[in-house]
């Protein structure tokens, strides 16, 4: 236990562990610096990987290391911990850590934030924030912390939050700034199972390439996101960006056609290339605010979409010849339903193939 009883920033100082540990001969596949057995935990402390960008490594090519913290049994806890800089944050995916509790984590992990799976049940991930400025806003005089500016790197290399085989997981009031994937759902590498039913409340992804990504899902997957704020920013080396990505390619067999992603009360803004890319499964939006919708707001390349009581605020210039719209149903897309929505430039959509566009908005 360290000196902090509240969430804290690198610049606030306090109890810290400075490390040059890089996994030894095993490198990033080595043991974690801190290993938490059942019922063990860490709180009130700051961690800093001093050699992340030294000795032949740099901010463009930082050192690869194991996760700083690994849970190895049930009811582990990580509370009021800050990662000033590190390659990987918290591993709750390699073991069953049922009942894990993560609260008020902050920091800048470069390649991995918090990864959760392993069949864990009843865990909590809440009130955490990942942001590159934890690596550059230091205490008075520096106090030995490495000064690193990692914005561009994390935007192209980090997977901040990963959820795989978990049950009854509480995912509440979390925020990620700068990541390839802000929040990411995928098949479990340990159990081989897919994400089941889970609810995400108050999640924010900003400065991300894909703010929410469902990579793997079976017929029983049902992810509900409530009060999300999903944001893209212009990232020079990321030519495709979207708030939502359902499946990694058109009609991918990694996402079952009956897998469901449901978003309620969502705020979408920034600089997307496409608002939502749907490659398979069923995605539903209810009360979404598309402040910017990109070239195509809801781009159904495979699978289905439903859009209810939502607002499309981006103006579409006359004479775009179908290159822009609030929706596109691709050749292999099955259907899009549009009901009770408002479009600042009127309902504009593009359609290829035999799929169906329907709902009260289609006159």
Identify the residue ranges that each predicted region occupies.
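Extracellular beta-strand-rich solenoid/capping regions of secreted or surface-exposed proteins
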Residues: 1-44, 48-76, 88-95, 116
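A structural detector for beta-sheet-dominated domains
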Residues: 20, 35-37, 48-53, 70-72, ...
